[in-house]
Amino acid sequence: MNNFIEVYDNVLTLEQCDSIITYIDTCPNIERGLMGMGVDVSKKDSWDIHNLFGNETDVDRMIHNALSECLKKYKIKNPELDSIGYWGLENKYNLQKYLPGGGYPQPHCEAGFITDAQRVVVWMIYLNTVTDDGGTRFPQYDLTTDAVAGRVVLWPTSWTHFHHGVVSKTQYKYIATGWYSFVS
């Protein structure tokens, strides 16, 4: 049975991932990660950069190109997505850094607030390989996706796909994440 969680490996090269990590580590606009409407490090302990694809940076282009190929494959496997109305890549996305012991262990879905109801599919790119946990757990499907550099994961945003980060006590974790959403 299709759980609608798709994993695509080697979508970004290690060099591309390292380039994005360097951007995260040197960006002056990094701030504590928001969860819902505020910061609560007991539920989500991260450092985030809020980016826009319209900035046309090398980071934007690398991520956009990687996602384009994955979405084509995702839609082939899930053709019903073409019949639900017009939707596309949301302009905003997040680059996130989790320190050892940090993470997002709070189970959540990506359309849990009325302000997020337009979201259709979430995307996440692992930018580094984490060998001490560090993946993403989907408890309803008894599935954990491992954090492997260059790996893209796509899944539905709704309550049917609650997930949470698996905290690494010893290693950093870097991801890029965002959404495909209905467009008016």
Question: Can you say where each PLM-predicted feature lies in the sequence?
Answer:
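Fe(II)/2-oxoglutarate oxygenase catalytic core
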Residues: 1-152, 160-184
